Amino acid sequence: MPRTLSPAARIERSILSDFRKPLWRPFVRGIKQYKMIAPGDHIAVCISGGKDSMLLAKMMQLLQRHTDIPFETEFLVMDPGYNAENRQRIIDNAALMEIPIRIFDSSIFETTKIAERNPCYLCARMRRGFLYDRAQEMGCNKIALGHHFNDVVETTVMGMFYGAQLQAMLPKLHSRNFPGMELIRPMYCIHEEDICAWRDFNALHFIACACRLTEERDKSGDGIGNSKRAEIKQLLKTLRETNPETNCQGLFNQIHKKSTKRCQKHRMAPDTSFDRLHFSVQQVFAEIRIVWQLVDIWLPAPLDFG
C-alpha cells in the first residue's frame, strides 16, 4: 500500500521531481555559479507571504538536506502592517508547508503614507533595513530574498524608463549600512511563469502585493494603479504577446555577464542606494541594440551605430 504523503511532502516532491528542471536545477546552479552560500553561513530567509518567497523558503529547506555545505537558516516574516486576513494566510501557508516562521511586527505601511509621490521606494528601503537589522540580531550573516529572472529584467527596464540609466539587480552584494551582512538572491535564474505553474500545480494560494496603498489604488479597477513595476510587467507581457521575438533572455544574459565580471573583479559589489549595479554611459550605448529590441520600437530604417 503506497504511503500517504503530507501536504508539505507533496510540495517538496513536486519541486524535486515535477519541477526539477525549471525550478530546482536553476536554483542550485545559481547558488553555485555566484557562490552565494559558504560553510558556516547563518541565513535569514525573508518571507513576504507571496509565491516567490514561500517557494524560496521551501527550496532553502530542501537545500539544507541535500547539500554537503553546512549552513543554518531562519525564516523571517516582517509584518509591515498586513490586514488580519493576509497575516493569517501567511501563517496558514507556512504551517501547510512546514516552514517554521518567526513573525516580527512593524508599522512601515503607516509610516510610508507620508510619501505621497514614491511610497513604494520608501517602503522598500525601510523593509530592507528592518530585515537586515532583525537578521543581524538573530545572529545571521546573510539575508536571502526571492527575486527571480523576471525581477532582474523588469528592474533594468524600469530604470531605463524612469531613472534614465541602465542598471542591473545583482545576485549577491554586501551591505554598507550593516557591516558583515550580505544579501543573496538564490532564485536569480528562475522564471516567474515556472513559479506560477508550481503554485497552481499544488493548488496553493499565497498573498499578492499586500500593500494598503496598492489595495486602495486597485479599487479603481485598472489593476495597475501607480505601481511603476506593474506597468513595466504589463508592458513586457504585451510585447511578448504581440512580438514573440522580444528577447528578454538576451537582456538577462548581458546583465549576467556584467554582474559576473563585477563580482569577480571586486569580489562582491557593495549595497548601493538602489541596491543595484549601475552601468557606465559607454556600456549603455554598447547594449542599446538590445534595448531597441526589447521595447519593440519600430523605425523606418535600421540605426547605424558605426
What role is predicted for each listed range?
Residues 266, 271, 275-278, 296, ...:
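Intrinsic-disorder-associated, low-complexity terminal segments enriched in Asp/Asn/His/Tyr and depleted
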Residues 120-123, 140, 211, 263, ...:
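Disulfide-bonded cysteines in secreted/extracellular proteins and peptides
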